[in-house]
Amino acid sequence: MRIFKIKAVPIVGWSSKDAFNMRPPPIAIFWLFIGLFLFGVGETMLIGAGIGVSPWTVLAQGVSVTTGMGIGAATFWVSVAILSLWIPLRQKPGIGTLSNVVIIAATIEFVLPFIPAPEGYVGQFALAVMGTLTVGIGSGIYLVANLGPGPRDGLMTGLQRCTGQPISWVRTFIELSAVICGWLLGGTVGVGTVVFAFGIGPAVSASLYLTARCSGHRLGSEAD
């Protein structure tokens, strides 16, 4: 299906012309913030589900167990390692890169108290699925703004350019790699972790496709 075979982040009428743009269109900033807010809400839902953390948190846990450093420090160094991979991939940062960290963290802090505790395992699983879909929707919207991706999304788009593979496949490969490495290092994998690892790639791809179509952009070369 074309919706899952997007091979580039679409540039639409309201996208910034360049990621490193110091005077981006206000509409691009608006959608950047909306996308990142939804991203944060989705992460909060995954946390609230309580059946497994995100793949990159599993990796940070593994690094923490192996090295003895705190989980916060491990998360920081994992992010630094991801950003260092941007150099050979020639990935450009932008205001969206910094906004990614600030807005998502602030959203989690604000929204978490309002997430109701799910009743039973079915409720937990459903919340994890909804969280994954919401992260995917938010990712697609903020990436189309073209103001710079966050660390993980930058790795995704950079690897996609190098390999030519669909974004959904590349993202799934990245998330599964993080899960496996984290688990081997001693991190804890839950059902929610697996849901996110397999679901986020297709969710991001679908969001990119739908965001472009809703913006009046015809998809041709982006997908087979």
State the predicted function of each range.
Residues R2-D224:
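Core subunits and conserved enzymes of cellular information-processing
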